[in-house]
Every structure is written in C-alpha cells, then in structure tokens.
Amino acid sequence: KEKGSYTMGEFRVTINPKNKPATPEVNWQQARVLEMQAEYADAFDTQTGSYDEMCAAYGEERKMWNSGGPEMEETIEYQIPYEGYTVPVRLLRPVKAEKLPVIFFMHGGGFVEGDNDTHGLVQRKLAAYSGCVVIGIDYFLVPEVRYPVAIEECVAVCKYVNTINLHLHIEKTIWFPLMY
C-alpha cells in the first residue's frame, strides 16, 4: 500500500504532495499543509485504522490550524451536569464587559471526531471578531454515545447556561447556536 493512500468505500484515494500542482499559484503554506495531511492519511484509513488512532491523528493534524490567533480576556473550562455525568465546555470572553451576547459553538467532525482543542482558533476568532462570549460545547462522540445524545448534550448545556447566566455575565436575550 502506498504511503498517503486510503480507501473510501470502493474508491482508493492517494495524497502525494510531491505531485506537480495543478497551478503554479500553490504557495509554500498550502504545500506544507498538503505534506502534513499526507503524513496523517494512513490514520484515516477506515479499513485498517482504529477509531482511537483516527482521533489521535485528527488532534495532531489540527494543532497547526489552531496556533496563534486572538488573545481572550478570559478562558474558563466548565463541566456542565447532564444525566449522571458532565459535559465539558469552554467559555471564551473576548473583552471585559458586564454582559455580552453568547454564541454556542458545536464543533464539526460529524459527531465522530473533534473537540474544543481541534476548533480552538476558529472559536477565538469568532469571539474576537463578533464581540460575543463563545461557549464551546465538547459533546461526547460516536461511538462513546449514540446519536442523538450529542445534540441532547448541547441542548442541556444551553438550558443550564440559561439558568446561571448572571454568574457568567452574559446577555440572556441574545444567543446564537452555531455548528461548524
């Protein structure tokens, strides 16, 4: 099997960053991204790789995408109770203010992979550019839980935050759910 190749259903996909680019406009940053993604391609082969290997590789691959970015006035990790366990959340406050609108951020990954760390930069940028508090919900993933538990956890976090909004210094009337 070639390095950087994997199977998706009946298709074999090969990522080879040494291939000639289709256009000479590919810059050095994008070339580095293609090289890095090729390094992790084997971990995403669902025919041979394990779920744990895939999640670990995804976390490593995403580190490059999450460095730098805006500084937050406050970053707090919370554990929100739900049905006998807790759901981790991260509150990002971009500026010191008495009350700010809230964006509830539910990361992408198809309910299979990802967390607040793999989507940290986009959360910080969202907070900084919108002026809103961003609450990243680190819902549990398949196969740890079955669908629709992740969505139920997100709803539970929103309800819980609604009951303690004064403690968090957020504006109760302006909320935006966002799944990215």
Give residue ranges: language-model regions.
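Short beta-to-alpha linker loops that shape the active-site pocket of alpha/beta-hydrolase fold enzymes
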Residues: 138-142
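Short beta-strand element of the alpha/beta-hydrolase
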Residues: 99-108
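A glycine/proline-hinged amphipathic helix-loop "lid/cap" segment
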Residues: 1-91
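Short strand-loop-helix active-site module centered on a catalytic nucleophile
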Residues: 89, 104, 126, 147-180
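Short amphipathic alpha-helix adjacent to the substrate-entry channel of hydrolases
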Residues: 117-136
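Conserved catalytic-core motifs of eukaryotic protein kinase domains, centered on the activation segment
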Residues: 115-117, 145-147
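Glycine- and small hydrophobic-enriched segments that form the cores of compact globular domains
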Residues: 109-110, 133
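A generic beta-sheet turn/junction motif
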Residues: 82-84, 95, 106
